[in-house]
Amino acid sequence: MIWNKIEHCFGLKKMLKSNEYLEYLGEEIMDTFSEWTEVKYPIYVPSKARSTVKLTTKALDDAELNYLVVIEPQDVDDYKKEYPSEKLLVMDKNDMGIAYVRNYCKQHSKDNFHWCIDDNIKDFKVRENDKNVTKPTRNVLGAAERYIKDFDNIGAVSLSHHMFAFAKNSHVSVNKQVYSCALINNDLDIWYRNDCVEDTDYSMQILTKGYCTILYNKLLMNKAATGQYKGGNTDTVYAGDGRLKRSQGLQKHWPGSFKIVKKKERWHIAPSRVWDKFTQMPKGPHINLNKNTLQFE
């Protein structure tokens, strides 16, 4: 067990800083990466109007992982041409927005957590020897689940976009935004809101309620560029002034926390330091990192 290895390495009387523990845990999981083949929690892949774009689902099929493609009633016929019926979860309504879809997945899942993964992820990688190396999907998701197994205050975790991996040296970043390939805690009474940048808003809701988020810096997703494929959010949420309105909605919910900027003719939320104000750390029945040190009992 990883806990026993850490305890043996540092000794019973060794005081260990919180971030040191998280890094050591990350190193142990990466060193034993091939062992993490169990993906315990259900996987949902929301998809809209692009039944033939099989990126995420191919990666999951190749790994022989079960999943549900979450679709709207108006798309059923198209998706049935590409997927067996048992892999389709048909929502009740059409064109209700991203928040409705994500909340539908959360309500449908009966486990403690569920995966919600965008449909345009080509493959999964790890950061290894300063390179992004493609790895089995099953192991990447399994390692992500294992990392939080001993904690009970995690609201959500996510993989990082592979393009950002070069800039991060640590295994994880605590209390940052989660997005695109996220493992969501179903036990929290927190819901996505449709009038804003939903992933940012959901992460902020988690943190303001005192829970933690974890962004994996060495477990990565190779995600297609926004707009590369028709359908999805490209033709709805981001169309026209949709991007600007969602950014303004985020400002409404979190006054003073986010600034809107325009880059390459598109509106964006500028990088914010708001995340730095959340100082809570992961904890569990035998682990509490909130005093910046950990003493094994």
Set out the residue ranges of the language-model regions.
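C-terminal catalytic/acceptor-binding lobe
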Residues: 13-42, 50-51, 194, 200-297
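Short, well-formed alpha-helical segments that are part of the catalytic scaffolds
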Residues: 24-32, 43-64, 75-82
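Short loop->beta transition adjacent to catalytic acidic/histidine clusters or analogous donor-positioning motifs
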Residues: 37-42, 60-69, 85-87
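Short, solvent-exposed loop/turn segments at secondary-structure junctions
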Residues: 50, 120-122, 162-165, 220-221
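A structural signal for short, well-ordered beta-strand segments and their strand-loop junctions
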Residues: 69, 113-118, 155-160, 213-217, ...
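Active-site-proximal specificity loops/subdomain of glycosyltransferases
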Residues: 72-115, 122-133
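Conserved catalytic core of nucleotide-sugar-dependent glycosyltransferases
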Residues: 124-208
